[in-house]
């Protein structure tokens, strides 16, 4: 302590006391706090494991309880409770010590009286033995009162225990009559040890059971004593031994040592053999009592199904609200095959039972078993048949629906437990409506599939495969619901579903559910080839009457009439006719599409002026074969057409003139001359109307025709050519070596496309910034057309620069001239002007004088 005080007084270490970094964690914070429910792990043998060797092989004596005490501790509230319990236990121990002091005196008196009774004759000592027995039993009752709880009721095991005691007593009586007094004593002592062992072993389940057994023994012995006869005098010793066993059973760990000491004192007179037996019994008692004490300390271990909870009526009412009463539903979870008979015979056919037949089809099972079959094994087919139970239930469901639904009241809530379990029970029964028959080539194939697949879960469906062998003499006369002999594994898609009844708390009833395959197929987009090969009967839902008739045929009832058979045949014929009509419609649609593909006519109509005329011309040209003419021939044809038109117009004019002017008209007459002139004017107007409208309109028509020709310019088949832009770019960027290789293979694609750089419509590419081409952009691809555009852009830019330079030079020259003019002195310029004017005046005077 002095050294510690010196360290703390030292200024260098003074901050250690205040700095939390140097503080040690208190012991209560070091351990993990646990609930009182886990208190038993500190002293229960189930949690105890002794280590004889450490991890390096050195011998040690260590147990897991030490580790548990090191790391875990009870919470504060539980520790307070444990403190109160310890007080109560200490008080009980004090009471037990008081009772045991009395018990020692009683046991000594009993031993002395036992010796006296052995020495005396049986006839003379009957009254005394009866009195002693009654006194001993009364004393044992008083000693046991402190250990027996008044609230505990007797268990069922107590009856067995009492019956065994009676049997053992009868054996003891027989031994005593045959042997001498000394042998009697030995047999009696051995009998006591046996009586003590047997109830300890059989009735060591809980402490309460032991205490109930004690009560029954005491009542039985008291009744037996009162009704005893002269031939059963030796039961007194057995009763005394029972009292000793009762005291051993009802005692705790600490009181047990005192009982063993009393047993040893009483056993000194009987011999060394009895001492050894008693020691063994005491050791067993200690172990069992320690376990009982552990259980009593830790309380009932409900997690392991041990112990009972006694609650009041109020608690029972509360729990009844929370947990509903059991309605008697015991579902066969994973035990649907428990009633199936077992046999060693292996056949080539397997039966698949207890599956979700609403979702599973024969092809699903065939695909599954094909993946498990051995090499060389073959599965011929998988057929799904209705069971006899399924037929009966389906008949009932057609009339009134599931029986389980009828038993549920209408006003029952949706989350009602009983109604939900009834539906679950129905779904479990629905698994037995059908069964599948797997036909294999050999018993070896069937046994291999059985070993690998029996009890296996199908995907994640919560339905487990139940396989059984079918004897060879069994035949199936019913029509199968579904058959599968082949599966296209490349196109097959596995089914992912979950049976709600077997995998979830909520239950979905499936008796009126539509076929899931039908839903998926109708929602899917079909291809044209699939529509032709499709079986429409699988996806077209027939009327309810037809369904009933078809199901009656499948069930094979004997009571079906001839008229009903006729109706079903008619319905089948109607369905076939409908299917044939659908197929004809599909064939017509496909033929039209094929014709369209052959013609390759995909027209896009744009309403442009002059479209009708141009379309008529195109049709005429195609009919006459003019579209295949060369440009020169087309030019000649146009000239010929113009000549034909002129000839027609002349002929029409001549006919009109002949019709209008009669033969007897005198043209020299002035009256007729004026009329002829008017007719001429009218002719000219008619000709002009025939030739066309005004020149402005003719110009507009020509312009529209030019636009139309430009639009229809690419309609010629010779000009049509497909090109792959990406391949052109790739081939242009290749090295010379690779280009040569492609040239040899004739796979090199050359860029023959030529851009009209001078087209006025695309001049904005060279001037506007919106269409600027950036060669540094990653999306830029170098082609011949792009190079031409860039060259043209550069050329136009140079031209603009030259124009700018020329304009600048002109301006500079003009500025220089102006500057030169401005550079002359104004006085000098005035002098020059005055000289000029004077010279002009002088010359003018001179001329006048000369005249």
Curated annotation (Swiss-Prot):
Modified residues (Phosphoserine): 75, 77, 79, 82, 134, 153, 179-180, 198, 296, 298, 312-313, 614, 657, 663, 694, 735, 823
Modified residues (Phosphothreonine): 311, 693
UniProtKB keywords: Acetylation, Coiled coil, Nucleus, Phosphoprotein, Transcription, Transcription regulation
Pfam name, any one: RRM_ESF1
GO term, biological process aspect, one: rRNA processing
Compositional bias segments (type: Basic and acidic residues): 101-131, 154-165, 197-210, 564-573, 794-824
PTM-bearing positions, type N-acetylserine: 2
Location relative to the cell: Nucleus, Nucleolus; Nucleus, Nucleoplasm
Compositionally biased spans, kind Basic residues: 90-100, 640-650
Function in brief: May constitute a novel regulatory system for basal transcription. Negatively regulates ABT1.
Subunit comment: Interacts with ABT1. Forms a complex with ABT1 and suppresses the ABT1-induced activation of polymerase II-directed transcription in mammalian cells.
Stated name of the protein: ESF1 homolog
Classification of source organism: Eukaryota, Metazoa, Chordata, Craniata, Vertebrata
Originating gene: ESF1
